[in-house]
Amino acid sequence: MTLRAVLFDVDFTLCRPGPELSADRYARIAARHGITLDTSRYDDARDAAVLNLKRHPELLHDESIWHRFTEEIFIGMGGQEAIASECATEIEEGWGVSENFELFEDVLPVLEELRRAELRIAVVSNGIRDLQAFVAHHRLDVDAIVDSRSHGRVKPHPTIFQAALVLLAVAPEDAVMVGDSIEEDIEGARALGMRAILIDREERHPDVHERLTDLYGLPAALGLARPT
């Protein structure tokens, strides 16, 4: 392997949702409809919705599936099925706004360090927002942008990784995938012959091989010389 490129997941790898995309946003929208949600149930509701999302083995990007995903979180927090779709539409509008996401503090300095090492960089993401606009807003210096919305398949489908590799003009064995999802990012990339490193910011997976708790350790994990 000759390292030539690094592919990054986006959500919870490079950025986190800001206040406008938190459980409180669900609660505020529900309150306008006279519904009280239990924000303490957000994490469990989201985990359950993720499990249902994985029941679509064809791995097609389908906006109706993402809409249902948001509805299920709303219902899981105590919302009513009758108004779930309307509330989900309002919630999803916030996910399309680049300003509603905050970069982790380690992102820009680490991307700069990868550039100094003359590595090519891509972002590969599942989701419904305009990733080109997100990259431009946050001034991410990348060579390739691939999202499920434009590609048509979601990670861990091999073609979404392959699309990024083609744009970067590198072979799988010469690239590394960095992401926070074991199934979507790590297993998906390794199945294609790529090296993959889990970014585990909340330290949920201590037993995973090749794991970092922040991006500051990535250059060393890649064997890059530290700048002098």
Question: Where are the language model's segments positioned?
Answer:
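N-terminal helical cap/lid subdomain that shapes the substrate entry/recognition surface
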Residues: T2-L108, R116
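Asp-based, Mg2+/Mn2+-dependent phosphohydrolase catalytic module
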Residues: M1-V6, R16-P17, L37-S40, A82-E86, ...
